[in-house]
Amino acid sequence: MIEGIGIALQSYHDTAISAKAILESAIAQINANYIGAMLAEKTKEAKEIYNSTLAESRTENYDACLAILDEVAGQAKKIVEQPVPSDFISTLEALKQMKEPTKTEIETVVGAYKNNYFAYRAICDFLKLPKPVTVDVINDDIADIKSGLYKCFYSYNVEAYRFRNWIEGNILASYDEVFRAFCEGRFEDAVQSEQGKDDGIEAEKLNNNG
């Protein structure tokens, strides 16, 4: 769902590496062929081309990442906007009359409404089931990714571990599982994916600090 972000990061990485190599080669040739004011002018021109190439790739790929995340936010919003089934309220009222619903009864009710956001949330709250992933959690996750991407494009060196980890590590894949499950109405899976994502990110932090 957000695999395009990894592609955009890789594109920016490759452009930056290539532009750096071209700049270093150009500077070497300039140093070998020019002196004085001409040396300074040619060096300035080479660096301007390098910076322009980097800026163009940065803007293009960063904007592509933001567009992908905006699409996720839009899909999540549509999921939340889905109305509850017409029979849900009566079902919930009937459930409230039971002092001790059986495991099978609980599974039946959950199974009937597990793909509707508000119905599933209400059932989980009433039956004290594991707290579902809310749309606010999804929006917070999106904000976290945006923060990390800004650092990748505007702070981190593309050869640094923190940048490469966004491409080579499991960060994006972990978020992708959460977003995909939520936007497909698989709210039970979203809970597991969110926990797995949090555990994975915490492990990445420990490895980085170690």
Where are these regions (language model features)?
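Charged, low-complexity interaction regions
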Residues: 27-37, 135
